[in-house]
């Protein structure tokens, strides 16, 4: 049953945002093979990676790649997930970065934690002030990055059909993703669909 409650953002007068490939930066979070074939495989990976690939192609057609950021998670040698020097650590092959696209390596859930992402976005000028987030997992790295971006003053959009997750103890994935997106929409971001991001 859906709620008719007003969001916090509505109550304080923050309007919904929108984005195009010309006025925003696409940030692809942890779209790595771990989430397709590893221990952390997400339930909706086929659908979400298609949405991510569509957005990436749209941004590529619109510019020079500077407003495209690939964030990849790195772990110590021998780790059970994202294992270095194995396919699990690699980004989905259809998302392989082109020349001019930024790659950020992170070690924490937030894409901003101990990385140069904030500095890079500031250097882009206006196009770096609005960020469009996609990737995995909704309740960890996507959520944490969204909140950090909002705290840093970015206009944040999360593409709901381009983020994924898995069942966690006590919560099925459908409920988990729905709650995460509702939380983010309430206080930190505008949640949109892939088709809402205009060329």
Swiss-Prot record:
Catalytic activity: [(1'E)-5'-(3',3'-dimethyloxiran-2'-yl)-3'-hydroxy-3'-methylpent-1'-en-1'-yl]-quinolinone B = yaequinolone C
Keywords associated with the record: Hydrolase
Pathway the protein contributes to: Secondary metabolite biosynthesis; Alkaloid biosynthesis; Mycotoxin biosynthesis
Hydrolase as UniProt keyword: yes
Keyword S-adenosyl-L-methionine: no
Gene Ontology molecular function, alphabetical: hydrolase activity
A family per Pfam: Isochorismatase
This enzyme's EC code(s): 3.-.-.-
Active site, UniProt feature: 30, 106, 141
Gene3D superfamilies (UniProt xref): Isochorismatase-like
Entry-linked InterPro entries: Isochorismatase-like_dom, Isochorismatase-like_hydrls, Isochorismatase-like_sf
Domain of life, per lineage: Eukaryota
Enzyme class: hydrolase
Known role: Epoxide hydrolase; part of the gene cluster that mediates the biosynthesis of penigequinolones, potent insecticidal alkaloids that contain a highly modified 10-carbon prenyl group. The first stage is catalyzed by the nonribosomal peptide synthetase penN that condenses anthranilic acid and O-methyl-L-tyrosine to produce 4'-methoxycyclopeptin. 4'-methoxycyclopeptin is then converted to 4'-methoxydehydrocyclopeptin by the ketoglutarate-dependent dioxygenase penM through dehydrogenation to form a double bond between C-alpha and C-beta of the O-methyltyrosine side chain.
Family membership noted in the UniProt record: Belongs to the isochorismatase family.
Protein name: Epoxide hydrolase penJ
């Amino acid at each position: 049953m859906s709620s008719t409650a007003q969001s916090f953002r509505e109550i304080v007068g923050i309007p919904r945002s929108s984005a195009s490939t010309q006025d925003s930066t696409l940030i692809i979070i942890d779209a790595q093979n771990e989430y397709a074939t590893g221990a952390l495989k997400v339930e909706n990976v086929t659908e979400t990676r298609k949405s991510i690939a569509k957005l990436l192609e749209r941004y590529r057609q619109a510019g020079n790649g500077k407003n495209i950021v690939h964030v990849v998670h790195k772990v110590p040698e021998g780790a059970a997930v994202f294992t270095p020097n194995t396919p699990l650590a690699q980004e989905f092959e259809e998302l392989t970065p082109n020349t001019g696209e930024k790659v950020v390596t992170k070690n924490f859930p937030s894409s901003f934690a101990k990385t140069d992402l904030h500095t890079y976005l500031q250097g882009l000028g206006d196009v770096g002030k609005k960020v469009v987030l996609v990737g995995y997992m909704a309740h960890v790295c996507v959520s944490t990055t969204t909140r950090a971006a909002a705290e840093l003053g970015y206009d944040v959009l999360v593409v709901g059909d381009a983020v994924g997750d898995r069942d966690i103890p006590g919560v099925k994935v459908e409920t988990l993703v729905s709650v995460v997106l509702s939380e983010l929409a309430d206080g930190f971001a505008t949640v949109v669909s892939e088709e809402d991001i205009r060329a």
